């Protein structure tokens, strides 16, 4: 069983279910899969980032394999996604919110666990981001999509912000659920505001064809 403090464990399990449901719904949207494929991809989304984190901080076996609640909630999210997949178009807003919830909670938990393992500030922030985006990256790769974290839109940046707030509050001696929720809220708000206003991370300038190529219409 997990040895996390109860408030952080509750946050971690919430993110696990949210990412399991979101990951499975995203998989249904991207590829035609049977129930096994949907559940497996939901579990990969929910557990993949945490497994990568635990391997990197040498916390083995990973927490996802030691506590039945993690894989049970991830699988439950996948099964629920399969059950409601016929209403996928109407669920688009829910998919977006669930993704932001999972991203936020995992960024906070990942950074917190990295600090507990003795990592310095910058590595802890990076592990927070890896925890948040790792599972979704594996899922997207398996269904043949460019991973969400590599496409336009704010994704890794909100996770980094949430991890940074977690590190800052911990380093100043502020712990517990209020601090974790505050850090998660920062990540969630940046992600949702970025989507609402269409804010993207900086992109390289477009390359223009040499010679007499036609100009793109704006």
Curated annotation (Swiss-Prot):
Native source species: Streptomyces coelicolor (strain ATCC BAA-471 / A3(2) / M145)
Bilayer-spanning residue ranges: 8-28, 37-57, 64-84, 91-111, 118-138, 154-174, 179-199
Disulfide cysteine pairs (residue numbers): none
Family: Belongs to the UPF0126 family.
Membrane association type: Multi-pass membrane protein
One CC-aspect GO term: plasma membrane
Classification via InterPro entries: Gly_transporter (IPR005115)
PANTHER family per the UniProt record, alphabetical: INNER MEMBRANE PROTEIN, UPF0126 INNER MEMBRANE PROTEIN YADS-RELATED
Name this polypeptide is given: UPF0126 membrane protein SCO4104
Location in the cell: Cell membrane
Family matches, as Pfam families: Gly_transporter (PF03458)
Keyword Ribosomal protein: no
Protein keywords: Cell membrane, Membrane, Transmembrane, Transmembrane helix
Statement: the UniProt record of this protein carries the keyword Transmembrane: yes
């Amino acid at each position: 069983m997990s040895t996390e403090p109860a408030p952080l464990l509750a946050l971690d399990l919430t993110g696990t279910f949210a990412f399991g449901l979101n990951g499975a719904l995203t998989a249904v949207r991207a590829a035609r899969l049977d129930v096994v494929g949907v559940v497996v991809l939901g579990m990969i989304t929910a557990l993949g980032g945490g497994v990568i984190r635990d391997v990197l901080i040498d916390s083995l076996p990973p927490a996802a394999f030691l506590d039945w609640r993690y894989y049970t909630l991830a699988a439950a999210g996948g099964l629920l996604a399969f059950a409601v997949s016929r209403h996928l178009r109407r669920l688009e807003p829910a998919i977006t919110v669930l993704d932001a919830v999972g991203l936020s909670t995992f960024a906070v938990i990942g950074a917190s666990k990295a600090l507990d393992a003795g990592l310095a500030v910058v590595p802890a922030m990076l592990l927070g981001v890896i925890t948040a985006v790792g599972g979704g990256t594996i899922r997207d790769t398996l269904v043949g999509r460019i991973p969400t974290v590599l496409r336009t839109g704010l994704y890794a940046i909100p996770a980094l912000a949430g991890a940074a707030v977690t590190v800052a509050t911990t380093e100043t001696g502020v712990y517990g659920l209020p601090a974790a929720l505050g850090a998660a809220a920062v990540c969630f708000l940046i992600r949702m505001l970025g989507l609402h206003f269409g804010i993207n991370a900086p992109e390289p300038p477009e390359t223009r064809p040499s010679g007499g190529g036609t100009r793109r219409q704006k």
